[in-house]
């Protein structure tokens, strides 16, 4: 049996049955039209906003019914369900024509709808639901269905969910005709920005950027301790920011890095977890950050470059923790590195392929220069296209370019169905005022305890993420959770970044961690074990959002000194947390030392500046005592450290309340003693480690 074609244009180029050729022709035609339309709009300006959104969504729906048929792959023979696929495709094409032809009467539908208008609205609603079910499964439909039922029967719900119900026709108008439902902000972002950047990512893949990132990462880190895993982290970060898909990143870079980690002795679950955590982090890594950053900029009414700047420190901290966790694991298990003679030379990689960084430089330069995000995307696409001509093997031939367009259209079709479903959720929530009721109810339950609101919000995001994409989780949280955080006084960008992180982290959160589940078969690992390892490695993603809610300086808000201090404190705390989870710092850590380091880590992470030095002392002291002394004598050291840290914490809090100079002197004396002891211990540890090194 011959292999199925990977693209519609490949099917058209070879000897294929007539039904397959017809399907491939339709997919190729719709995908090319879809990509060309958005590229034209990016260069010459988009048509009227509502028209652009409607054409975008209906063409995306048409592509979904072609590329995601029932009961088979698109390239397999037709079956009994093909008639439904054809019906969905035909209705989508008809809706495209209908919305374009009747655009002038769109505003009138807010107050009066004809029978044909009603049919078109119901058809749009049903097609969106079926498209989401085909591409993402039933989870988001269940969530959307709950909010629609609530809107219709709000007077039958208890507590904060009680309210006046919406009439069916009023709700239908809110979901389909209004600009706050299916054709609202999420679809607007998809049509204006996301398609162009996905096309940019497809063109980069065409010219070999993925292989270049892998070679560059391995040339830099392959020969170091834990080299393959570190290279996986770096390459996944670079590719993930372009692809915007954690699962897609796992399946591309992971296909190379995971088997290599396995051959060098890494546990299957750890290899899969490393790739999943790194690929997930690509979605929070500037400058592209996947689709969510564009949606966030739209909701916040901010420039995209402001979102990018705010994301730099949290993303750096996330990858720092994964990088260190991989290093600690390699040290703990005694895993080596790749021989240098088996690795590419960094200078040669950059000399031969460094030009592939040019499109990325165009994005950064365009954003810094203040160009519009659409113009930046168009320039980057042109740069990627031109770079393809440097090597004969990557020439952007017409077939390759059309395959890139097809890939971009397929990816966007799935995302657009998700955005439309999220629009249903938002429209249903605002049709009944549920958002306000939930906000007031949550604040009354949590009272003045912001941490409780954050815990409730994070848990909700994780539950929603069990089967929903990060974009869908974020958009749902915009309507449900973010108003709660804003009402509690959290800065707007911190509230939205909180939602972003917890929307992304669902990819590595058991029991349904989609990125880890995608990596597990490649590594031959148990999916649940892989998801647990991914969550451990990506623990920073659960902590960092809470940190920047309490310390907005981590989002570049505030004076430079505060930003530097908060970043340094967070980095030290997260390093201690990574070491505690792995069980290694400069030597293996015992359970008491790991517990002490967790306590010290959270003291450094806490927003009060007085706790930073105490937490650092506790974590560093625990590691030193554990490394320097035998198990029996170490218990005394751990106990003394714990008592000292508690005493300093109590004195510090009392001083903050009373401002007593005597307490201040006691605090300073204690901290000075501790710093001197830490310095002496560090010197002793350094001499001991140096003496063990071979000459």
State what each model feature region is.
Residues 214-282, 292, 301, 470-503, ...:
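Hydrophobic transmembrane alpha-helices that form the pore/transport pathway of multi-pass ion
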Residues 44-54, 80-84, 109-113, 293-294, ...:
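Transmembrane helix-loop boundary segments of multi-pass membrane transporters
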Residues 201-205, 236-245, 277-283, 367, ...:
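Transmembrane alpha-helix interface/packing and boundary motifs in multi-pass membrane proteins
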Residues 2-22, 32, 309-411, 514-605, ...:
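Long, contiguous bundles of hydrophobic transmembrane helices that form the permeation core
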Residues 115-119, 180-193, 220-232, 264-270, ...:
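Membrane-interfacial loop-to-helix junctions in multi-pass transporters
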Residues 27-31, 52-66, 84-93, 118-127, ...:
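Hydrophobic mid-bilayer segments of alpha-helices in multi-pass membrane transport proteins
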Residues 1-111, 118-122, 674-690:
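Conserved, well-structured core domains of diverse proteins
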Residues 130, 135, 145-154, 160, ...:
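Core transmembrane alpha-helical segments of multi-pass membrane transporters/permeases
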